[in-house]
């Protein structure tokens, strides 16, 4: 890693200054689970609920990240790791600005999720495992990815041709095939409110 020879951190406004301005604390809510499990759907519900309560938040997901800053990455193991590393670094900036950050990424291994937790900081990281079974995710298949993976058109597809490790350290586990969306959103919103106020 290249050393920054002109560090300015000691002259920047502090995290506390920014959180005081917003009247909230920053936190990273890291949603993990298979494609189609409901990560983004639950996160969007949480975002709407937090917004209605005057809480500033931002969703980071594969669509908005891979279309921009990570558009040069593929799906090899190395690229997936770099994808999550960059997301965690960006998310850390949001969190340190006092923003509730909702990150929705498959992030299929415990190592990769632990890396994100270390980058963001354990005290600012809440891991949410959307544990919807693969059969339900495949039934939903909103983007047609499971069908393409089954035909061999998508390589390294988590759950089909690449493994997904159940999280070792999830703070919350939600199966969206059993728990209604409204209940999932309420559970997470209440948990977040308790952490940031």
Label each PLM-derived region with a short phrase:
Residues 1-28:
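Extreme N-terminal, non-catalytic leader segments
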Residues 68-75, 91-149, 156:
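ATP-dependent NMP and nucleoside kinases share a basic, alpha-helical "lid"
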Residues 31:
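Hydrophobic anchor at the beta1->P-loop junction of P-loop NTPases
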Residues 59, 125-129, 171-173:
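Conserved beta-strand scaffold positions in the cores of enzyme catalytic domains, especially
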Residues 131-134, 139-187, 195-196:
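Small-molecule kinase domains that catalyze NTP-dependent phosphoryl transfer to phosphate-bearing small molecules
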